[in-house]
A protein has these predicted regions:
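Ordered, amphipathic secondary-structure segments that act as subunit-interaction surfaces
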Residues: 119-129
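Divalent metal-coordination and catalytic microenvironments
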Residues: 52, 73, 97, 126, ...
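Divalent-metal-activated hydrolytic enzyme cores
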Residues: 33-35, 40-68, 101-107, 114-119, ...
Length: 204
């Protein structure tokens, strides 16, 4: 059984070895909307808002609504996977849809249908990666742990998987078999290697 300790063990996989980095101080920018945590340390959100101020100062917009390269990417939310960097994309080039695992669920089908039918995308790229947290647990264990903590079972599936290559293949089939996705002749799947940065295509 997983329980609260089990869920904690699962969560620890995601944070092990994380580098915290230096904190930025919004006070130096004269911000009046800073929200320190209980220890008095600046929140990450406030640090990122500081970054946004610098970003907005040199921002060139607005860009056209349809993606310039007419492509949609579905990728894992893992922080080590920089989709724009890995594919050489710029802002405005593609729709980038991210979730835990990069799996195809009803919500990804919804987004892809809107992307193609209303915003002109034609190609779809699916990206999983090595050392994924979704390899470290099962759906049953996850639901059991949540139930033991909350007394509730989530209606949604976590979509954990035992092999990232097999799950990419399954994701391709889910996209190409959907009646809601009109363009399925250019649906390709890849596994991103978090150690080398290389994308390996999954075929068959």
């Amino acid at each position: 059984m997983v329980g609260s300790q089990g869920l904690g063990a699962i969560a620890s996989h995601f944070v092990a070895g994380r580098n915290t980095g230096a904190l930025f101080h919004l006070w130096s920018l004269g911000s009046s909307h800073v929200h320190p945590d209980e220890s008095g340390t600046m929140s990450v959100t406030d640090q990122l808002l500081s970054n946004n101020a610098a970003y907005a100062a040199s921002f060139n917009g607005p860009l056209p609504l349809p993606p310039a390269k007419h492509v949609a990417v579905v990728a894992c939310m893992d922080a080590r996977l920089n989709v724009y960097g890995a594919l050489g994309l710029d802002e405005g080039d593609a729709h980038v849809i991210r979730n835990a695992g990069g799996v195809i669920t009803e919500d990804e089908i919804r987004s892809l249908a809107i992307s193609q039918r209303l915003l002109g995308t034609k190609e779809i790229i699916l990206i999983h990666h090595t050392d994924c947290g979704m390899l470290t647990f099962t759906d049953d264990d996850f639901k059991r742990g949540i139930f033991e903590e909350t007394g509730l079972r989530p209606a949604w599936a976590a979509e954990a998987f035992a092999n990232e290559y097999e799950d990419v293949a399954q994701s391709i089939k889910r996209v190409t078999s959907s009646p809601f996705i009109p363009h399925t002749d250019q649906v390709r799947g890849f596994v991103f290697n978090v150690a080398t940065g290389v994308l390996e295509e999954v075929t068959g």
